[in-house]
């Protein structure tokens, strides 16, 4: 139906006859000459119809926005005065000699202009129109280039693309599963995979050595800007490779991706222990573009007559920390400080103490703060020295339980970086390593930091003796404060796997019921293996500069995990429910389509 794409035409096509197909982006009637901007996925070209072609001109006069056209004409150079430098095809136009209206279009509910202020709910309701916008077209085309480049890299490095099951069984991986009732197995359910984790490990046991998959995964969890109930991850697993080797081959892929697609070259990516990330940046995914650090001052305030500091300073589970903002005296108003005090309250902080350094040589009168009178002069001097304060700086303080201070000041650090535009680079990748194996839950038990298949850096006996001290052989790749993904060396010994299950409170009976197939596989000569997974949606979101992963997914769900275009999830008829042996409990007469039904057997 066509000979060229609209956006692919250029001066080399002058005097050639072409046939184009596309949508009407804009139509203009200038003194008896009709101009139509015809759009396809490659771009826009101007088509001209004049009264000399009587039938075509009459037809062009009927054309409206978003009509679908087929146009035949001759490419010609534009007059110098009409060249449009803002269009890739701005030097040429097509003089139309034939026109066919392939389909008409109703008036669209919102303009497709890139700068149109359209609510996201409307965009998602008419996603098939929203996807026509240049921004969305560019995002999805770029996403395709990313997946193609990843496949090419992994293929070259000997990885095999293997699909794993979508219908599987529920396993504890940290989030709620999406369950699928079985019609043929009364009372039983499949689960949609949160990741291909166990299957890719089994492929290593089976001897496939290097596996990858662009995998669809599902998690029934609360949504944020960078979360979706169904998402895509770049899943990788290898055998007979050390942690450093796995990280190196992955880093090579990451660096090649940015160089080839964005002309950005990264130096070797820094490795940072988890403990340093938490201590200095208040996060296990620190944004290294921000030149602010948390500084612990607990030892300096243990004996002060100021309970706000002294209490946490003498509590082994608490933390007293300073965060210096260079030049903060002039940059931050009292109202902003009050706003930041409210902000840290989101993370459980009871307040936000601060000191303004007006003259550090005068420790009596040169410091401005509601709390400074509670700190002896030697303590003031020690704090200024430790944080490296200069005149004009402002120092924030956090004093509370370790988790509260870490999260509150870590978040404040990121907010200050954004609000004051403190970024020192456009991109800052980082490997975070040496994670703890476990963390304590609210009931005093242990939960896995990553997942229960991560290998520790110690023996099973040492692990059981002191779970809280054990470090894992895990690693996360962080970019600009966003966790792109992570992985670990896996457990390949049945004894070690059973030791981890025991620490997590999984009984031998439950181990056999839920993980018997894995324990069996590990007992039949499982090789040392490890891998990782990247969130493709998050990666593309960062690379194109989108504010949400919904802008890099063709048909995403809303913040409430619904599709407003198809009204999914929806109700099903009684016959289907009976076939699945399901009865709805507390069913409403008119249940909104976006509400998930509550299942009861």
UniProtKB/Swiss-Prot annotation:
Assembly information from the UniProt record: Homodimer.
Protein localization: Cytoplasm
Entry EC number(s): 6.1.1.23
Record's protein name: Aspartate--tRNA(Asp/Asn) ligase
Reported function: Aspartyl-tRNA synthetase with relaxed tRNA specificity since it is able to aspartylate not only its cognate tRNA(Asp) but also tRNA(Asn). Reaction proceeds in two steps: L-aspartate is first activated by ATP to form Asp-AMP and then transferred to the acceptor end of tRNA(Asp/Asn).
HAMAP family with a match to the protein in the record: Asp_tRNA_synth_type1 (MF_00044)
Site (Important for tRNA non-discrimination): 30
Enzyme class: ligase
GO MF terms, alphabetically ordered: aspartate-tRNA ligase activity; aspartate-tRNA(Asn) ligase activity; ATP binding; nucleic acid binding
Pfam families: GAD, tRNA-synt_2, tRNA_anti-codon
InterPro entries: Aa-tRNA-synt_II, aa-tRNA-synth_II, aa-tRNA-synth_II/BPL/LPL, Asp-tRNA-ligase_1, Asp-tRNA-ligase_1_N, Asp/Asn-tRNA-synth_IIb, AspRS_core, GAD-like_sf
Binding of ATP, residues: 219-221, 228, 483, 535-538
An annotated GO cellular component: cytoplasm
Catalytic activity: tRNA(Asx) + L-aspartate + ATP = L-aspartyl-tRNA(Asx) + AMP + diphosphate
Region annotated Aspartate, chain positions: 197-200
CDD domains: AspRS_core, EcAspRS_like_N
One GO process term, biological-process aspect: aspartyl-tRNA aminoacylation
NCBIfam families: aspS_bact (TIGR00459), PRK00476.1 (NF001750)
Major subcellular location class: cytoplasm
Ranges that cross the membrane: none
UniProt entry keywords in alphabetical sequence: Aminoacyl-tRNA synthetase, ATP-binding, Cytoplasm, Ligase, Nucleotide-binding, Protein biosynthesis
Residue positions binding L-aspartate: 173, 219, 450, 490
């Amino acid at each position: 139906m066509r000979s060229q794409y609209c956006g692919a035409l250029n001066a080399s096509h002058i005097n050639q006859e072409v046939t184009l197909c596309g949508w009407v982006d804009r139509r203009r009637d200038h003194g008896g000459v009709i101009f139509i901007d015809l759009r396809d996925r490659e771009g826009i070209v101007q088509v001209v119809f004049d009264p000399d072609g009587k039938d075509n001109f009459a037809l062009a006069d009927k054309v409206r926005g978003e009509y679908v056209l087929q146009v035949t004409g001759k490419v010609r150079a534009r007059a110098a005065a009409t060249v449009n430098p803002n269009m890739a095809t701005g030097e040429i136009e097509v003089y139309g000699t034939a026109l066919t209206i392939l389909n008409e279009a109703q008036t669209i509910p919102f303009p497709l202009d890139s700068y149109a202020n359209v609510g996201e709910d409307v965009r998602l309701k008419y996603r098939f129109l929203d996807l026509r916008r240049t921004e969305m077209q560019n995002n999805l085309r770029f996403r395709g280039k990313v997946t193609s480049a990843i496949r090419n890299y992994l293929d070259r490095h000997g990885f095999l693309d293997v699909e794993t099951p979508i219908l599987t069984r529920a396993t504890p991986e940290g989030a709620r599963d999406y369950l699928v009732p079985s019609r043929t197995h009364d009372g039983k359910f499949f689960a949609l995979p949160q990741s291909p984790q166990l299957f890719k490990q089994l492929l290593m046991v089976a001897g496939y050595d290097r596996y990858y998959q662009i995998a669809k995964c599902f998690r029934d969890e609360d949504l944020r800007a960078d979360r979706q109930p169904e998402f895509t991850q770049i899943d990788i697993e290898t055998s007979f490779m050390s942690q450093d080797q796995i990280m190196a081959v992955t880093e090579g892929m990451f660096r090649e991706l940015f160089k080839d697609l964005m002309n950005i070259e990264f130096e070797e990516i820094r490795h940072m222990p988890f403990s340093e990330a938490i201590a200095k940046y208040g996060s296990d995914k620190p944004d290294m573009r921000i030149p602010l650090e948390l500084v612990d001052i607990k030892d300096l305030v243990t004996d002060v007559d100021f309970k706000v500091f002294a209490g946490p300073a003498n509590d082994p589970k608490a933390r007293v920390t300073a965060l210096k903002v260079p030049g903060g005296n002039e940059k931050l108003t009292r109202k902003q400080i009050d706003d930041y005090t409210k902000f840290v309250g989101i993370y459980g902080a009871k307040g936000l103490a601060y000191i303004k350094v007006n003259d550090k040589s005068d420790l009596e009168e040169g410091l401005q703060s509601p709390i400074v009178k509670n700190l002896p002069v030697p303590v003031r001097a020690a704090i200024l020295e430790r944080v490296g304060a200069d005149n004009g700086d402002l120092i924030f303080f956090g004093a509370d339980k370790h988790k509260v201070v870490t999260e509150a000041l870590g978040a404040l650090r990121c907010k200050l970086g954004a609000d004051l535009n403190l970024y020192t680079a456009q991109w800052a990748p980082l490997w975070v390593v040496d994670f703890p194996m476990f963390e304590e839950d609210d009931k005093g038990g242990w939960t896995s930091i990553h997942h229960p298949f991560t290998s520790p850096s110690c023996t099973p006996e040492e692990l059981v003796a002191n779970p809280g001290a054990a470090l894992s052989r895990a690693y996360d790749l962080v970019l600009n404060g966003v966790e792109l993904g992570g992985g670990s060396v896996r457990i390949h010994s049945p004894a070690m796997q059973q030791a981890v299950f025991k620490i997590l409170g999984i009984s031998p009976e439950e181990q056999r019921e839920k993980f018997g197939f894995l324990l069996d596989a590990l007992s039949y000569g499982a090789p040392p293996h490890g891998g990782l997974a990247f969130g493709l949606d998050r990666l593309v979101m960062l690379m194109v500069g989108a504010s949400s992963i919904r802008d890099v997914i063709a048909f995403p769900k809303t913040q409430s995990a619904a599709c407003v275009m198809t009204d999914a999830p929806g109700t099903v008829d009684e016959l289907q429910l009976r076939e699945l042996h399901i009865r709805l409990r507390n069913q409403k007469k008119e249940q909104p389509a976006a509400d998930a039904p509550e299942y009861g057997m």
